[in-house]
Amino acid sequence: MTNESFKSGFVSIIGRPNVGKSTFLNRVIGQKIAIMSDKPQTTRNKVQGVLTTGTSQTIFIDTPGIHKPKHKLGDFMMKVAQNTLKEVDLILFMINAEEGYGKGDEFIIEKLQTMSTPVFLIVNKIDKIHPDQLLLLIDEYRKRYPFKEIVPISALEGNNIETLLAQIEAYLPEGPQFYPSDQVTDHPERFIISELIREKVLHLTREEIPHSIAVAIESIKGQDNGSVHVAATIVVERDSQKGIVIGKKGSLLKEVGKRARADIEALLGSRVYLELWVKVQKDWRNKMSQLRDFGFKEDEY
């Protein structure tokens, strides 16, 4: 294989909240790099997954769910999503087969009309509907936008993923290998660790603490015995939320720690001692300086 025919490019995954973008990314890359939760808007920064094969390198950008902003954090997420689309080689517009066409999709298709980037329609969760329904759904979308390819998949089950990856590679331009072969994301470990902790809090608190939570990593230190000490603070907006995150006699926080530790150990490949605190910072979502502390960098957007 001569290097001249090597292909590389950037692929953006967009769609309404909860269509399975993170599940797809994690299935393709084979590691838990995008936070997965069934609450809308759980992906906040541009998590990049890097897939390298003998013939190509695909850099996936997982944009926040496109939605009409409600506050500064929402504004921020919307801006990231739109700017990302201008810089990529291919856009994967993912929909949930069960939900069908909706207002949120109209909003996204409107944005796509102004772009020259090729767009694939990815119909996810096909294991949940009848094939006849699937064909009707595909027709519905085909009428509204000239998609280059339409690919039905199940990210969770892995159905049709290989076919999709081959089609993506066909659309990539020839180019260099941007990242080393063994690199799966360009986010530093500190960021991934904070996202893993955040994911556990979202899972365990359900609706009570939707997006009023950020995780700040205070320190990551290697110990003499080969283990790693991680200290992190979970930041909430109200005192009542602090009580929920800590739980009865600290039970919920303990469970967050237990689950997060298992994932962090898998990520780092060593034993981890995880220390967690909970802190209240009122209305952090509307304060830009605090957004910056939590890794939302304005200059990237």
Curated annotation (Swiss-Prot):
A GO-annotated cellular component: cytosol
Topology class, membrane: Peripheral membrane protein
Gene3D superfamilies (UniProt xref): 3.30.300.20, P-loop containing nucleotide triphosphate hydrolases (3.40.50.300)
Residue segments, region G4: 124-127
Disrupted gene: phenotype observed: Essential in some but not all strains; in 168 / BR151 the null mutation grows slowly and forms irregularly shaped colonies after several days. In liquid culture forms chains of elongated cells with diffuse nucleoids that occupy most of the cell. Sporulation in this disruption strain is severely impaired. Essential in strains CRK6000 and IS75, where it cannot be disrupted. In CRK600 in depletion experiments cells become 1.5 to 2-fold longer and nucleoid distribution is dispersed. The number of replication origins increases, suggesting an increase in chromosome replication.
Induction: Constitutively expressed, two-fold induced at the end of the exponential phase; this is under control of Spo0A, suggesting it may have a role in sporulation.
Stretch list, region G2: 41-45
Function in brief: An essential GTPase that binds both GDP and GTP, with rapid nucleotide exchange. Plays a role in 16S rRNA processing and 30S ribosomal subunit biogenesis and possibly also in cell cycle regulation and energy metabolism. Binds both GDP and GTP. Complements an E.coli era disruption mutant.
Additional information: Estimated to be present at 3000 copies per cell.
Name of this protein: GTPase Era
Gene source species: Bacillus subtilis (strain 168)
UniProt lineage: Bacteria, Bacillati, Bacillota, Bacilli, Bacillales
Gene: era
